[in-house]
């Protein structure tokens, strides 16, 4: 079979104006970024404000292997399957971060015959949104350091600055740096550090904002540091939220592209799900809901991370809950949860599938606990055997949950027709949605509920630093915000090697970070890194460009 990039380059890509026409947008309604990409201006969205919203399908997954389980692939393939059935459908995805693309993933725009196009552009610089976020974030750092240099009128304590610089790369050498060296003319020396751009609160703000005015209001609330008298210092105190919003003006507009089969796709925003909230922008999802009858969207990593945050954070801003949830499962991941070594995952082992099923079962029950209908999509790999597939189907159906074998990687939309057919019936059902926690509950109670009811843990411990931060959050009146858990994606716990469905474990909250602009509190569990490093053999070693500009090696 051809590689992803070979399939993408051979695809018959349509002018983006043709794709826009499918969803009722004229040439004047879009801003072209070349022939195959466009942005949708916010004023165009206002035209559809009174239009009824379509059905919303959330695609999530079990706890993944390092290679991922194909959520984006299934999301794209499912949308194409609905389109083949004559449905008015759109897909809404996150934009890939360049760091993981160059590092381990080698591309994140779907796979096989279920991809979004133009694949190379989407995986690289796309329409420049992430670069705009990088610039906005680092402009804040520049204004902050300038305030220190110019007499420190805000009385900022340089030892208590929590705002970091960012770059959209995996670069471990930048995790801890010192700035302001070289004498009085070069600023105030202090410790600093870099995060990867998609971890920036600016990314979360962009993804949760609903208008330019909302964007400015959220930016003004971002907490940058503490003063010497331990009061929060915000971007609003610096007085540059208007300038930062100006830098993000175009990045706020959703990006329109297409799938291999010509289904309209909105790709906008890309926060990580193990650190941030892991969902594409509210504006893109709202736009898709107004312009189509069915919207397929995904949330990063497993249902314990992106799935939980989609339901407890994003839906509160979106004003709509999913009408159904698809949980993507792979036999290789289930065998990993069943105790097999990574080298053994391509070999048949039905017993390991049965043992690892505990992971999928917990994710199913978690999503059902929100009152949502659930279907399992088995994302087929070439190494899967009939016996393993049969065992997984039997186990899933024994729970009373529908299941579908999807072959969208190899067959595109055709390989998702069964999933689309089963979902069509489910979308007619009424869900009885309820949130995991009430926003008025204490922050500690919200964290307890996520850990005990979603993860299966027994106790939450807090570091001395986290206890102090909890008191500060209460004193500042931030207690009624949702919690955004930051932990490993590989396990329900905060320990990446504790696989399947562990119970009775304890987790430790080491830090609580106020993301007031985004509108949530981040609870850092375990050893989550906000700036990834590159592997020994990064995916970029296989990437190249020919003399005539043709790219290779983006998986």
Swiss-Prot record:
InterPro entries: Formate_THF_ligase, Formate_THF_ligase_CS, P-loop_NTPase
Keyword Endoplasmic reticulum: no
Record-listed ATP binding positions: 65-72
Keywords: ATP-binding, Ligase, Nucleotide-binding, One-carbon metabolism
A biological-process GO annotation: tetrahydrofolate interconversion
Keyword Cell membrane: no
Record-stated family: Belongs to the formate--tetrahydrofolate ligase family.
Protein known as: Formate--tetrahydrofolate ligase
Gene name in the database record: fhs
């Amino acid at each position: 079979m051809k590689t992803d990039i070979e399939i993408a380059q051979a695809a018959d890509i349509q002018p983006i104006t043709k794709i826009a026409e499918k969803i009722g947008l004229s040439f004047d309604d879009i801003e072209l970024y070349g022939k195959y990409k466009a942005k949708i201006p916010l004023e165009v969205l206002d035209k559809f404000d009174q239009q009824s919203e379509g059905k919303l399908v959330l695609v999530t997954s079990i706890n993944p292997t390092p290679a991922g389980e194909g959520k984006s692939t299934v999301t794209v393939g499912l949308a194409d399957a609905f389109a083949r059935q004559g449905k008015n459908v759109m897909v809404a995805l996150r934009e890939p971060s360049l760091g993981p693309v160059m590092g381990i993933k080698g591309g994140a725009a779907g796979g096989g015959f279920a991809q979004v196009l133009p694949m190379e552009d989407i995986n690289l610089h796309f329409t420049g949104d992430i670069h705009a976020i990088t610039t906005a974030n680092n402009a804040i750092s520049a204004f902050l350091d300038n305030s220190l240099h110019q007499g420190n009128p805000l009385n900022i304590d340089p030892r208590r600055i929590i705002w970091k610089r960012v770059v959209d790369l995996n670069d471990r050498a930048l995790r801890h740096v010192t700035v302001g060296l070289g004498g009085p003319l070069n600023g105030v020396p202090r410790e600093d550090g870099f995060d990867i751009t998609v971890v920036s609160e600016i990314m979360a703000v962009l993804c949760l904002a609903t208008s330019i005015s909302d964007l400015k209001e959220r930016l003004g609330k971002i907490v940058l540091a503490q003063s010497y008298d331990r009061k929060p210092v915000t971007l609003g105190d610096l007085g540059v939220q208007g300038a930062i919003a100006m830098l993000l003006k175009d990045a706020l507009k959703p990006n329109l592209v297409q799938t291999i089969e010509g289904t309209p796709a909105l790709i906008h925003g890309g926060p990580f799900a193990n650190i941030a909230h892991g969902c594409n922008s509210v504006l893109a999802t709202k736009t898709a809901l107004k312009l189509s009858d069915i919207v397929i969207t995904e949330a990063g990593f497993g249902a314990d991370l992106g799935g939980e945050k989609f339901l407890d954070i994003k839906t509160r801003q979106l004003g709509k809950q999913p009408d159904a949830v698809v949980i993507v499962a792979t036999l290789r991941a289930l065998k990993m949860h069943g105790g097999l070594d990574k080298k053994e995952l391509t070999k048949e082992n039905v017993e390991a599938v049965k043992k690892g099923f505990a992971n999928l079962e917990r994710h199913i029950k978690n999503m059902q606990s929100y009152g949502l209908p659930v279907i399992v999509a088995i994302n087929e790999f070439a190494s899967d055997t009939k016996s393993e597939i049969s065992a997984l189907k039997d186990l899933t159906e024994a729970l009373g949950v529908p299941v579908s074998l999807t072959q969208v990687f190899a067959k595109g939309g055709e390989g998702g027709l069964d999933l689309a057919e089963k979902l069509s019936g489910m979308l007619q059902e009424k869900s009885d949605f309820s949130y995991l926690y009430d926003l008025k509950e204490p922050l500690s109670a919200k964290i307890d509920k996520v850990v005990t009811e979603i993860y299966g843990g027994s106790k939450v411990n807090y570091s001395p630093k986290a206890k102090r931060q909890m008191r500060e959050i209460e004193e500042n009146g931030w207690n009624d915000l949702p919690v955004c858990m930051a932990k490993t994606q590989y396990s329900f716990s905060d320990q990446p090697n504790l696989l399947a469905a562990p119970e009775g474990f304890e987790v430790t909250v080491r830090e609580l970070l106020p993301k007031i602009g985004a509108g949530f509190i981040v609870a850092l569990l375990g050893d989550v890194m906000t700036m990834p490093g590159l592997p020994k053999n990064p995916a970029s070693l296989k990437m190249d460009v020919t003399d005539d500009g043709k790219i290779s090696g983006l998986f």
